[in-house]
Amino acid sequence: MATNRRVSRVAELIKREVSQMLINGIKDDRVGTGMVSVTDVDVSGDLQHAKIYVSIYGTEEAKAETMAGLKSATGFVRSELGARVRLRRTPEVTFIEDRSIERGTKVLTLLNKLENARSLDDIPSADDSLDED
């Protein structure tokens, strides 16, 4: 069992290496359909499994196509990680679509709408100022 510090260091290293692979290592055209970025990597305590969370910008169709390309490139990514990262065993790689950025954007949009509606309610109308006289 690896220490928490080692697990987090390995996760950061995997994140950096997979990000580099997304830029110029994976030749599958489907991966380039949507803009892809690695948002997080969870590595198990025994360093045998790595969940790679990716954020994909684009249409739902482009996202599905990109995820299919990433899933088919899993073997390549694992073998490249084995060559680039010095570990006794290369972890099994799983790509998971991270929709937290989308959800965050939706929440911010809703908050902005509420703030705009509230500020419109706070502005006194011309009729209100005439009634006070």
UniProtKB/Swiss-Prot annotation:
PROSITE patterns in the cross-refs: RBFA (PS01319)
GO biological process: maturation of SSU-rRNA
A GO CC term assigned to this protein in UniProt: cytosol
Location within or outside the cell: Cytoplasm
Keywords: Cytoplasm, Ribosome biogenesis
Keyword Cytoplasm carried by entry: yes
Domain of life: Bacteria
Function of the protein: One of several proteins that assist in the late maturation steps of the functional core of the 30S ribosomal subunit. Associates with free 30S ribosomal subunits (but not with 30S subunits that are part of 70S ribosomes or polysomes). Required for efficient processing of 16S rRNA. May interact with the 5'-terminal helix region of 16S rRNA.
Subunit structure: Monomer. Binds 30S ribosomal subunits, but not 50S ribosomal subunits or 70S ribosomes.
Similarity comment: family membership: Belongs to the RbfA family.
Protein name as catalogued: Ribosome-binding factor A
Organism annotation: Trichormus variabilis (strain ATCC 29413 / PCC 7937) (Anabaena variabilis)
Lineage: Bacteria, Bacillati, Cyanobacteriota, Cyanophyceae, Nostocales
